[in-house]
């Protein structure tokens, strides 16, 4: 499986401002490249804290082009993703360490292997993604 990390930081090496704001620390060209990266992967993976703080859509949007949308994946050990989240619809997979409960129209699966902190272990996450037909994931 191909795993790609996309990361943006400010000049001082931070990923958010002192007040916790993290939206738009990059410019338009970098955001477009981020959407190209999204379109080039089978899945986009975020943690539940990103969902709670940013409520992202996690879609690939390229001007003038229609693209197949990647599977949206949320690592959510305690199943805190709100049913009202923008990504709590179809084409979303939530991987959790607790008994699965409905979250909007998203698929929710328990990942059996957990790390010492009670979170899904990365090898188990990759195995679950592979089982979902994912060959490449953008983090």
Q: What is each residue range found by the language model?
A:
Residues 139:
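Gly/Thr-rich phosphate-binding loop signature of adenosyl cofactor/nucleotide-binding cores
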Residues 2-11, 15-136:
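Active-site ligand-binding patch in enzyme domains
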